[in-house]
Each structure stands twice: as C-alpha cells, then as structure tokens.
Amino acid sequence: MTDGHHFNNILLGGRGGTNPGQFKVHSGGLAWKRQGGGKTIEIDKADVTAVTWMKVPRAYQLGVRIKAGLFYRFIGFREQDVSNLTNFIQKNMGVTPDEKQLSVSGQNWGGIDIDGNMLTFMVGSKQAFEVSLPDVAQTQMQGKTDVLLELHVDDTTGANEKDSLMDLSFHVPTSNTQFVGDESRPPAHILWETILKFADVGSSEEPVVTFEGIAILTPRGRYSVELHLSFLRLQGQANDFKIQYSSIVRLFLLPKSNNPHTFVVITLDPPIRKGQTLYPHIVIQFETEAVVERDLALSKELLVEKYKDRLEESYKGLIHEVFTKVLRGLSGAKVTRPGSFRSCQDGYAVKSSLKAEDGLLYPLEKGFFFLPKPPTLILHEEIEFVEFERHGAGGASISSHYFDLLVKLKNDQEHLFRNIQRNEYHNLFNFINGKNIKIMNLGGDGQGASGVVTDVLRDTDDDAVDPHLERIKNQAGDEESDEEDEDFVADKDDSGSPTDDSGDEESDASDSGGEKEKSSKKEASSSKPVQKRKHKARDDEGQEKKKPKKKKDPNAPKRAMTPFMYFSMAERGNMKSSNPDLPTTEIAKKLGEMWQKMSGEEKQPYIQQAQVDKKRYEKESAVYRGEATVDVDSGNESD
C-alpha cells in the first residue's frame, strides 16, 4: 500500500486474553479492528507519545503509548515487518520506536517502573511483566513491607480465557533505594501512594446511580442495574454480572414501532458468559413513557475534574434517555440511534423472523440490527451481497404477502430474515441501494433471480413506480412454474425453456404449444374444473385451495432437463462424498451457490446438453400429441 501497511491476524493483548484482528498503520495514525466485527481501536498520530518493539514467543510485539496514558500491545508481527514499520513510523509520525527485551530468566526480584498508568516490573534492563493500573480495584498495605494489588474481576474479562489474574503483591524491603521513605513512611508505603494515584480504587464502593426492576431480554430476567465509576453491575435473583466500561463497544437506543417500549442495547467485546453461553449484546427494554429523576452520587470536585461536559449533578426525563446519558458519560461509549430509514408505517424497523424467533429488523446507517432474540448486529462493510427471495414456492396465496431477505457476509456466513411484509419492499430496496450494498438478484444477472422478486411483488397495490422493479418485470417470463423442481436454480442461459412449465400437473399440449393453444386452454378451463388453471382461480377466490393431481399419462414424453439439472447430476455425487453428513436440502443449496458463481464458459457444456434434450422433448411431444388426437377421433367415430 502506498499510504501505509496492512496486516491480518494481529493480536490485541489485554486482561481478557488476545483477540485476532486487522492492523493498519497509515500516514494519519494506526487502527486495529477485531476479526469478525466488534472492538475497534483508532489512534491519531498526534496522540502517540512512544512506540516500542519487543521479541515475544514466535512473533514481535508493537507497543503504543498515547497521551491519555493508555498502552496498547499488538502481537504477531514478523521479523521483516519490524524494519519496514520502524521506517514508516519515523517518517510519518515523528516517533522513533525503542527496542525492549523480555526477561525469561524467571527471576522474581527487580525494580518497578511506573510510566503513566502502566506498572512495569523490570529484571535488570529487561521487562518481566506489565500491569495496567486502571485494572486495579483495590490496593492495601500488608505490614510495613508488602503492597497487595487486587484487580477487577468481571464477567467479560476472561470470557475467552480459562484463567484471569486476580491479585498480586510486591515485597518492598526497608533498604529499597528506588522508593525512598522514612520510619513513618517506609518504601512500601511510598509505592502504595504512587499506585493510588493511577489505580481505579474506590469505584467498587457505592454506585453512582441505580435503576431498579429493569427488564432485560438478553440475558433474560429482571435486574437492578448499578452504574459505578468504572463498571456496571446487573443484580438479579439468579444472576449477578459485573461489566467493565472498557468492554463496552457501543450503545444502541432503538424505539419499537407502535409499541410502548424502547430498546437500549449494550454491545460488549469481550462478551459476558453465563454457563456455556456468551452474550455479546445486553438487550434492555424500557417503558417509553416512563419518567424518572436521579441524582448522581458524585462529588463536585470529581464531577468537574473528570466528568466535565459529560455528566450533570442530576437528571430528569424519560427513563431510557436518562439511563443512556449517564452510561455514556461514565463509559465514554458512543450512542447509535435510528437513521434515515422509515417503514411503511413510519417506524424505524420492519417485522421479520430470524431462525425460529420473531422480532424487528432495524436498518441503521452503518448496519442492520435484529432484536430482541437472537440479537444480531450486521455491519454494512461486512456484507458481500443481499438477495430478495419470495416467501414460499407452494403457490399459496398467503406467500404473495411476504418476502425474505438473505444477507450473505464476506466470511460466507448467511442470515435469512423471513416473513417481511410485501409493502416494505420499496423502503428496504431504496435504503439498501442507497448504501451501495450489492443486491444479488436486482443486478440483471439473470431472469430467474429477477423472477423471484417479481413473484414477491406481483399484484402489489403500491402505485409508486420503481424503475428497477419495472425492468425486472419486463425481463421475467410469464411461463414460470408455481411448483418448480426443488433443486432448480434459474439462470439466464436456461430461463424460458419448456421445462419451466409444470408439465406433471397440466395438459401436455401446454408444454410446447403456440399462443392459440394457450388461449383455447384458458377458455376451456372455465368449463372443466379438473384443469389446474381453474384450481388457481379458486385459490384467488378463497375457495378450495388444492385438488387432486391429474394422473400423468405413462406414455407422455419425459420433460426436458435444464442446464442446472445436468450440472446437479454431475456434481451431486462429488458433493455427497466430500460432505457425507450434509443433509439433502443443504446439498441442493450448495449446488445452487456453485452454479450461480460459475462463468458462462463453465456452464456451456451443460447448456449444450440441455439444448439437445430440449429438441428431443419437442419431437417426442409432437409425436405424442399426434397419437393422442388419432385415439380421440377414432373413439368418437366408434360411438
């Protein structure tokens, strides 16, 4: 890259273990983003005060200290990366990286270096370990020579690790020359006072504010929510969670449409754990019209020094607004509210289903959020494409009132939002198209995909003219079957073939007959209730929806196969052998995905096979119709 360097699989070190992500250093600073979404760190070059390199097991570690006193550790660089990044940082940030060495001797005596909010234990000139002082919840003297540090133990730290550091102690002899004291204040006392200046001591005492009886949907229950200086606590009858503010990535304030409740979502990284279940989102539900008044338990000095322009002495207003403002002021997390999207009922979300759960899908400015269960956040930048799908293929009239939205991520993960009302299509399409997200079956790639959306929106009462929709309707054929083969994936190379008609259930004359035969068939359907066309009309009138299928003539010619069918026959065996545990429906789905990704040249052999079979079918159909006509005529004459 001309403007910087980009690295994958770089670990961010911290008390919660290491998390892999993408690291980028550019002329304006550096950034790290967790793999799969979540925590993001952006550092402006003007805030960088020191940079260090250290050789750690199997890799190199880049340490970055900023003006606020925070220290970040990025692990996973190769030896050849060190010189390139060193030159780039010197040139663009004006900071010369220092080289530190890691002590591996196992020696447990040495010196203590406190720089900003980091405590480093040094063995000679080498570093043994580091402790972030804001992670210290309590410190106390033990006798005259020992200093005990107790660290915050919360339900997010350690979610990815089996073990977590809880406490450690330092023995400072009276002969120590680094922390000079006297008889009343020995060296250990001097160290204790120094740590007190940076540690988060006292934050575990009385909460700043408490909200009683709050309904939390995930993890489910009613909790008392306590907001402390550095963490929040959820106290329920069966569960008790403690969450560091440093684990909060973002807050979401999302009103429910036509409902007296409002969601407040706390997104965490790392998540909290309950048994074997991880909860990356805490979904809180407030009564929208509830009004509260709260006074904060903060001294005026602390309010002015640390929380100036972030918190007030007291709050009065809607409970979800008060809660969000106080939590934002204490944690520093950003708040996301609904953006420009509006549903057909002027709401902020559309009703849909994810897996087996009904909920609301919120199209936001930078992502989609499905609530309340399972809470699913999808960022726009993680989406490879979206695809509109019809609700069902069984021909039932109710299916025309709903459609599905498939979201395919760049990591090959898929989310299918089902049962979205048909009248929400235009709003969703305009929003997604405005965000420049690729819409798979609205790009003119094939008539089959276009026909899916045409089926979804057929007979719509919306008078608004959508040029994209009109183009789709013009492209889509009128000959599509209502009961297609379950493995069939329509494509521009085979759409419009005779196999699109449901020949198993209709008269064979409709398979390849001309327009005259089709019109005569429609006229005959009014007087012959056994015809399928009459069956469709009775569905539209709300009467009997289904009638017994007409028995197929065993002498009728076999229908022509589509290119995809030939492809499926050729590849199904390979798919089964390589994935023996894959269900039949998943095999069909995988084959469909493979077919869609194939180029025109790759599809050509199967297209040629289908063309040959199509000619065979047309010839056999002509012969079959001729023989059937002779039999009918001769039968009438004999009567």
Curated annotation (Swiss-Prot):
It is found in: Nucleus; Chromosome. Residues 460-561 are annotated as: Disordered. Residues 477-488 have a biased composition (Acidic residues). Coiled coil: none annotated. One of its GO terms (molecular function) is nucleosome binding. One of its GO terms (biological process) is DNA repair. Residues 513-525 have a biased composition (Basic and acidic residues). The modification Phosphoserine is found at residues 634, 638. Residues 557-625 bind DNA. Present in leaves and kernels, but not in roots. Keywords: Chromosome, DNA damage, DNA repair, DNA replication, DNA-binding, Nucleus, Phosphoprotein, Transcription, Transcription regulation. Phosphorylated by CK2 following UV but not gamma irradiation. InterPro entries: HMG_box_dom (IPR009071), HMG_box_dom_sf (IPR036910), PH-like_dom_sf (IPR011993), RTT106/SPT16-like_middle_dom (IPR013719), RTT106/SSRP1_HistChap/FACT (IPR050454), SSRP1-like_PH1 (IPR048993), SSRP1/POB3 (IPR000969), SSRP1/POB3_N (IPR035417). Component of the FACT complex, a general chromatin factor that acts to reorganize nucleosomes. The FACT complex is involved in multiple processes that require DNA as a template such as mRNA elongation, DNA replication and DNA repair. During transcription elongation the FACT complex acts as a histone chaperone that both destabilizes and restores nucleosomal structure. Belongs to the SSRP1 family. Component of the FACT complex, a stable heterodimer of SPT16 and SSRP1. This is FACT complex subunit SSRP1. It comes from Zea mays.
